Each structure stands twice: as structure tokens, then as C-alpha cells.
Amino acid sequence: MRIYETMFIIKPDVSEEERNKLVENVKKFLEERVKAQVETVDRWGIRKLAYKIGKYFEGDYTVMYFRSNGQGLDQLENYFKVHPEFMRWQTFRREDLEKKERRAARQKTGETQENVSQEESSTN
């Protein structure tokens, strides 16, 4: 499965309780509809925007990392579009994290093979 990162910004005039509910709904949507495995949810809170969006100078930022086969990401895009509380969103495939994970797995496999070789040579 591939690793993805999605970041979205919720309008700051939405209540804190409603913003928390929206984040949970996105997580649930990813798990149930996209069949993704959500790994981390990182709430940044209300931050100043780089530029004004509509009438807003601030927004509530959230970043989610999840694993998915890539199917259903268009459904996530549509989910954000139909909910006016979301000002901006973007989803990226994190190939850098995938490479890092593969590299670590190869190193671990290499270490395991070295340990087996050392054990075999010490028993002879």
C-alpha cells in the first residue's frame, strides 16, 4: 500500500467542537469509504494563512498520514468539495516515506542474513 498525506484547512469561525467532529468524519471517511489505514492525525490548530482566502486570514490546519492503494482518492476530493467548512485541501503521495521504509526493511533483512551467516560460521 502507498503512503499518502492529506492536509486540509477548516474555516476558523466553525466551533471547536464542530472542527473536531469534521476531522473525525474525514478519518472515518478514509477508513470506511476509501479503505485506507489512517496512521497519524496531526492537528495544528488555528494558524495564520499565507494569503487571504475569501474573508479569512486564519484557518484550522490538520494533516493526516494514511496508507491506501490509491483507489477512492477522488471520493475524498469530492467529500471536501461538498462540505463548505473546508477552505483548502491537498493530498500527496509520499514516495519519500515509502523509499525510507523500503530501505529500512532491506537493511533489517541484510542484518538478519548477516546474523544467520555469523551463527553458521561460529557453529562450524
From Swiss-Prot:
CDD domains, A to Z: bS6
Spans annotated as Disordered: 100-124
Keywords tagged on the record: Ribonucleoprotein, Ribosomal protein, RNA-binding, rRNA-binding
A matching Pfam family: Ribosomal_S6
SUPFAM superfamilies named in the record: Ribosomal protein S6
Ranges annotated as biased composition (Polar residues): 110-124
Tree of life domain: Bacteria
NCBIfam families noted in UniProt: S6
Task performed by this protein: Binds together with bS18 to 16S ribosomal RNA.
Protein name, entry field: Small ribosomal subunit protein bS6
Source species: Fervidobacterium nodosum (strain ATCC 35602 / DSM 5306 / Rt17-B1)
Name of the encoding gene: rpsF
